[in-house]
Regions:
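Non-catalytic terminal extensions that flank enzyme cores
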Residues: 1-167
């Protein structure tokens, strides 16, 4: 929709971005924790296509107001990170957590794509989430794409076997 409304001929040097989130905070009776999706689509050059960063979060605070503040901080950090650290995906992920802790929020899935992220392996980004203590578990599908652990494991029987995976991307 935005691409059809923007007139590139009138604004050849402008870079555009969109930010979106779909989140639910904790309910009144505190039986359902907050969670949702956040993302940013942005250009680093007016003549390039757009890049996209999308991630899923679980909100850990026990107060809706605190969760809303956490969402605002994450959104601001995401936009800042997209424009300042797009060439360093690890730093971009770390910048999303500026002024936040795992006690506030857990990022359990992330996906980056676009012309500036062509060399980025999203599976490695998920492993960064584990390494940086932003989540406890990540899951890759058979196609190598990241999946949200809570969706994949919901109401499933699980067998865990200790092993090693070297290299993790093959």
């Amino acid at each position: 929709l935005i691409e059809s409304r923007l007139k590139r001929k009138e604004h050849p040097d402008k870079k555009y971005f969109t930010f979106a989130n779909t989140l639910a905070t904790i309910n009144y009776s505190k039986t359902v924790k907050g969670h949702g999706w956040m993302g940013c689509r942005f250009q680093t050059d007016p003549n390039k296509g757009y890049n996209e960063v999308i991630f899923h979060v679980r909100l850990n605070d026990n107060d809706a107001k605190l969760q809303q503040e956490t969402i605002g901080i994450m959104g601001t950090n995401l936009i800042y990170g997209c424009f300042n650290y797009y060439n360093e995906p690890k730093k971009l992920i770390q910048s999303i957590y500026d002024n936040l802790s795992r006690d506030n929020v857990e990022m359990d899935m992330i996906h980056m794509e676009g012309p500036d992220f062509e060399g980025v392996d999203n599976r490695l980004l998920s492993l960064i989430l584990v390494k940086e203590n932003m989540t406890d578990a990540v899951i890759f599908g058979a196609d190598g794409k990241n999946q949200q652990p809570s969706d994949v494991l919901y109401k499933k029987n699980i067998l865990t076997i200790r092993g090693s995976f070297r290299p993790v991307t093959k």
